[in-house]
């Protein structure tokens, strides 16, 4: 479905691998989130039990039965602006997975309660981005084998969509 949507729109999709640094360039994500000067690298991807992870963080709010945790390094090569993290997305071949903003803040205390971040030029910052995987949005068989489901971390949406292919086995 995501590929169909992309095919009827006039933009290209570029795929990257985990461990590869993706320079966003003049691309955008979200309506106002220009990312020129920023880059992303996915260092680790894991799918964990939601209850166990939330217990470690003493979090009692709503969360997915499972969580997709994307460990990234964010780098600023020369922008004076910041970026909104909540515009980043996790997609599959036919599904979008929502970010858990509460867990984002608990997993990254350095954000100090903000879902945006501004790095000084030349700086890097490591983050864990948590996404809720809710069984009701997947078929029973797909959810049972969610570790085999193809996920992509989208770091830019247009004019060029930039997707990092995620793997549990890297």
Model-inferred region functions:
Residues 1-69, 75-170:
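Conserved functional micro-motifs across diverse proteins
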């Amino acid at each position: 479905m995501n590929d169909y949507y992309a095919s009827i729109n006039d933009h290209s999709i570029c795929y990257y691998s985990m461990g590869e640094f993706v320079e966003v360039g003049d691309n955008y994500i979200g309506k106002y989130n220009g990312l020129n000067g920023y880059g992303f690298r996915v260092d680790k991807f894991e799918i964990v039990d939601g209850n166990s992870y939330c217990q470690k963080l003493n979090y009692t709010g709503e969360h997915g039965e499972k969580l997709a945790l994307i460990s990234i390094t964010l780098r600023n090569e020369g922008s004076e602006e910041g970026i909104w993290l909540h515009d980043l997305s996790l997609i599959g071949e036919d599904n979008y997975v929502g970010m858990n903003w509460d867990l984002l803040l608990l997993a990254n205390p350095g954000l100090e309660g903000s879902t945006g971040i501004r790095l000084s030029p030349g700086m890097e910052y490591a983050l864990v981005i948590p996404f809720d995987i809710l069984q009701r949005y997947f078929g029973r068989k797909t959810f049972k084998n969610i570790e085999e489901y193809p996920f992509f971390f989208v770091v830019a949406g247009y004019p060029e969509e930039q997707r990092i292919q995620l793997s549990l086995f890297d």
